[in-house]
Amino acid sequence: MTMNGIPVKLLNEAQGHIVSLELTTGATYRGKLVESEDSMNVQLRDVIATEPQGAVTHMDQIFVRGSQIKFIVVPDLLKNAPLFKKNSSRPMPPIRGPKRR
């Protein structure tokens, strides 16, 4: 079983939302996040690509290798994602030891 960190879990929560990627080459991609993997590989749909020189291109879909991603911008609404909530619904542990009178 693999242990996923917060960034990978957040990326999984962002599936179905519009995200922006900046690559190590300086290119940026903005589109709907279709799929993300534990290795940070992502698939985007309805993508607007902007090259470092400023050329803008529209693509139906694109797959980006995680090692080529410099950073990812996710929607602000994900700051309220369940993975950031404290698990306050856990019951208090029982009191142990002899009963006091």
UniProtKB/Swiss-Prot annotation:
GO terms for cellular component: catalytic step 2 spliceosome; commitment complex; cytoplasm; cytosol; nucleus; precatalytic spliceosome; Prp19 complex; SMN-Sm protein complex. Keywords: Cytoplasm, mRNA processing, mRNA splicing, Nucleus, Ribonucleoprotein, RNA-binding. The keyword Signal does not apply. Its main location: cytoplasm. SMART domains: Sm. SUPFAM superfamilies: Sm-like ribonucleoproteins (SSF50182). It comes from the Eukaryota. It is found in: Cytoplasm, Cytosol; Nucleus. GO terms for biological process: 7-methylguanosine cap hypermethylation; mRNA 5'-splice site recognition; mRNA splicing, via spliceosome; spliceosomal complex assembly; spliceosomal snRNP assembly; U2-type prespliceosome assembly. One of its GO terms (molecular function) is mRNA binding. InterPro entries: LSm4/Sm_D1/D3, LSM_dom_sf, Sm, Sm_dom_euk/arc, SmD3. Residues 6-78 form the Sm domain. Transmembrane segments: none annotated. Component of the Sm core complex, present in spliceosomal snRNP U1, U2, U4/U6 and U5. The core complex contains SMB1, SMD1, SMD2, SMD3, SME1, SMX3 and SMX2 (Sm proteins B, D1, D2, D3, E, F and G, respectively), and is probably a heptameric ring structure. SMD3 specifically interacts with SMB1. Plays a role in pre-mRNA splicing as a core component of the spliceosomal U1, U2, U4 and U5 small nuclear ribonucleoproteins (snRNPs), the building blocks of the spliceosome. Also binds telomerase RNA and is required for its accumulation. Belongs to the snRNP core protein family. This is Small nuclear ribonucleoprotein Sm D3. The lineage of its organism: Eukaryota, Fungi, Dikarya, Ascomycota, Saccharomycotina. The gene is SMD3.
